[in-house]
């Protein structure tokens, strides 16, 4: 089976072309291929299919075999993969479990993505806790050692954004895992830890649902900016700094789409012997 590996800010993905060939058992295959010791090694597998409602359809499989609704870094890599190996078209719409996602290749490795409008009610995220208007802005979640406050946002997948004073002193693994699996989140959640450097510059670390700590998360960066605006901590256009690099994120108005711009780079290609 032929594959190409891409990375977006160190968030790495195995891309396969299912336009030409049929592959069964994608969830099990994704878990196998993503294994960094016995497989190719990646945070996720992305398969590109034909679509009746968009240019292409993608399915994303996490390294644990689960299937998320959406992945911001992954969608940029999918755009670059299609341009490089299937059809050299600079504007593409992808069918995803989170709905249609529009992408544009701006430069050689720079992709802009219309991530759609954020969903902000607790029922949409989903989250079992809400404030008086049905949202989940700066709400407490009970943990073993007490409570932690955060803001719930869905970017097609659930996020809980926690603002911290010093991100270097934050135990991302311990707190992230506990929040991800908290009963307040019926579908579990991604967890972002965000330090506001200035209103237009954020520093973020992420615990991804079904993966763990990764170098970057595109939907998480978008959710972090939205949460920053909702908590009056940030401007609507900001640079989000992650362990793997930087993303530019913009939320022009309430109800508008969130736009994310960042890199997608090919790492290598090969053939996996099953």
UniProtKB/Swiss-Prot annotation:
One of its GO terms (molecular function) is diaminopimelate epimerase activity. Pathway: Amino-acid biosynthesis; L-lysine biosynthesis via DAP pathway; DL-2,6-diaminopimelate from LL-2,6-diaminopimelate: step 1/1. It is an enzyme of class 5 (isomerase). One of its GO terms (cellular component) is cytosol. Its main location: cytoplasm. Its EC number is 5.1.1.7. It is found in: Cytoplasm. The record marks 159, 208 as: Could be important to modulate the pK values of the two catalytic cysteine residues. The active site is at residues 71, 217. InterPro entries: DAP_epimerase_AS (IPR018510), DAP_epimerase_DapF (IPR001653). SUPFAM superfamilies: Diaminopimelate epimerase-like (SSF54506). The keyword rRNA processing does not apply. Pfam families: DAP_epimerase. GO terms for biological process: lysine biosynthetic process via diaminopimelate. It catalyses: (2S,6S)-2,6-diaminopimelate = meso-2,6-diaminopimelate. Catalyzes the stereoinversion of LL-2,6-diaminopimelate (L,L-DAP) to meso-diaminopimelate (meso-DAP), a precursor of L-lysine and an essential component of the bacterial peptidoglycan. Belongs to the diaminopimelate epimerase family. Homodimer. This is Diaminopimelate epimerase. It comes from Elusimicrobium minutum (strain Pei191).
